[in-house]
Amino acid sequence: MKKNLTNIYLIGPMGAGKTSVGSQLAKLTKRILYDSDKEIEKRTGADIAWIFEMEGEAGFRRREREMIEALCKLDNIILATGGGVVLDEKNRQQISETGVVIYLTASIDTQLKRIGQKGEMRRPLFIKNNSKEKLQQLNEIRKPLYQAMADLVYPTDDLNPRQLATQILVDIKQTYSDL
């Protein structure tokens, strides 16, 4: 049972549009958008790639868990999570208990296109050679976790962030009277 429905969490793979949709949700609701990866970078003063290089994935996931714990204590926020946030059971529990969880999906081709457009080929878990295979691997592992957490699911291949954000808010209001 959810304790708090005032937060909206966006989960899904890299390139699904979490930050783009989150930005529109924040504008429409007059809430603050947090991007967990950007918040980690702000707190540490280092970019995610550097953290992965110096501390490995385990070090990054520890920092991510601490950041999620801090952000989940806030009220009335929009949070765009990192794609791997679902790998940690504590993250899944905190997110599920403190807000509405929106799972944004995207095809591998859409993800590749968006990641390439943003110049994000340097993402730590994104291997430029075999990038399609790497995304498929990550999706196979993470998809069941995303699905288990999701309150609402939206495909974003034909994404118009503003229209999707508007639809999400309509659906949330129809589903949950607390928001």
From Swiss-Prot:
Keywords: Amino-acid biosynthesis, Aromatic amino acid biosynthesis, ATP-binding, Cytoplasm, Kinase, Magnesium, Metal-binding, Nucleotide-binding, Transferase
Superkingdom as given in the UniProt entry: Bacteria
Record bears the keyword Phosphoprotein: no
Subcellular location: Cytoplasm
Catalysed reactions listed for this entry: shikimate + ATP = 3-phosphoshikimate + ADP + H(+)
Enzyme class: transferase
Cofactor: record remark: Binds 1 Mg(2+) ion per subunit.
Residues involved in ATP binding: 15-20, 122
Assembly information from the UniProt record: Monomer.
Entry function: Catalyzes the specific phosphorylation of the 3-hydroxyl group of shikimic acid using ATP as a cosubstrate.
Protein's recorded name: Shikimate kinase
Organism of provenance: Coxiella burnetii (strain Dugway 5J108-111)
